[in-house]
Regions:
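Small/aliphatic-rich secondary-structure junction motif
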Residues: 1-58, 137, 150-219, 234-237
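Gly/Ser-rich helix-loop-strand patches that form or flank binding pockets
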Residues: 14, 92, 100-149, 232-275
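CheY-like receiver
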Residues: 24, 82, 102-106, 227, ...
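A short acidic, glycine-rich active-site loop
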Residues: 55-73
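N-terminal membrane-insertion helices
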Residues: 68, 72-76, 197, 201
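Ordered, amphipathic secondary-structure segments that act as subunit-interaction surfaces
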Residues: 71-78, 82-88
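A short helix-to-beta-strand connector/capping loop
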Residues: 83-91, 211-216
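Charged docking surfaces used in two-component/phosphorelay signaling
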Residues: 94-101, 220-225
């Protein structure tokens, strides 16, 4: 992996997201690009300042632009200072527009995007909306991470027996070639019923034994989000690899109940990839 994007908005500097980027940059060999997006959505501005959208006026817009410019300057300076202190190669991209659209565009030319859970979550679409849209539309894998950094000490790979889940697990394994040898790995096989067997499970296990040294296996019959959360609670500082989910399932995962469980906790980093 050679290029990691870390997404920031004009109001929230996620130090946790940057720390995860350092942690995953494979001994500093990856370029870390800070993408700072000035949200030009009027709805986002109005919500940020507690104003009614329909009373939005030019004076307020000027006030907000000035405040955003100040915060953006502070954030970029902080990012550059931290990267220099760590001796990490970095770039700064300053984008203006709708955050989801800008990051999807940037994702075409990146190996991974890291987003703090609270980044861009001040809009009226609700906490899960931005993250859900990114997970569905991004052109590279996305990691959503807590504000407080904890070193990753285990991996939880989710698997449903379908080719998309194999693709995501393989992509994670190839991106983070050094992690498998160091960390304990749990393969979570998820079925709809206890009687169901998963296609390709034996081949999946065979693949993992080539790449991972310390592997354990769990099976769960039921809803995917319940399986992930239940098993993750038993692991030490896990990174969740949502390899079992394609575009439609990502959308289902971020239903109101499932999203509130994950975002309220905000302590579980997740890696999501799809074709």
């Amino acid at each position: 992996m050679k290029k990691i994007l870390v997404a920031f908005d004009g109001t929230v500097f996620s130090e946790g997201a940057l720390e995860y980027a350092f942690h995953l940059s494979q001994n500093g060999s990856a370029m870390i690009t800070g993408v700072f997006i000035e949200d030009l959505s009027y709805v986002g501005y109005a919500t940020l300042f507690g104003e009614d959208y329909f009373t939005f006026n030019s004076t307020l817009l000027e006030k907000m632009e000035h405040e955003d410019d100040r915060k953006l300057s502070e954030s970029t300076e902080k990012f550059e200072q931290i990267c220099r202190e760590r001796g990490v190669a970095y770039e700064v991209h300053l984008d203006k527009g709708v955050p989801v659209n800008e990051l999807v565009r940037e994702s075409l030319f990146a190996d991974l995007i890291i987003i703090g859970y609270r980044t861009f979550f001040s809009n009226v679409m609700g906490e899960a909306s931005f993250l859900k849209d990114m997970l569905i539309d991004a052109q590279c894998p996305v990691m959503a991470v807590p504000d407080h950094f904890e070193p990753i000490e285990s991996l939880l790979l989710s698997f449903d027996g379908k080719p998309p889940s194999v693709y995501a697990i393989k992509q994670f394994t190839q991106l983070f070639a050094e992690l498998p040898a160091k960390l304990p790995v749990t393969l979570l096989s998820i079925t709809k019923t206890k009687e169901e067997t998963l296609e390709y499970e034996q081949l999946m296990r065979e693949y993992l034994t080539v790449h991972y040294l310390h592997i354990s296996y769990e099976t769960f019959a039921g809803e995917a989000e319940d399986a992930i959360l239940n098993v993750a609670e038993q692991l030490k500082n896990p990174l969740i690899i949502m390899g079992a989910f394609g575009r439609n399932a990502v959308s289902r995962f971020f239903s109101r109940s499932a999203a509130s469980k994950l975002l309220k906790n905000q302590s579980l980093p997740i890696f999501v990839s799809h074709r």
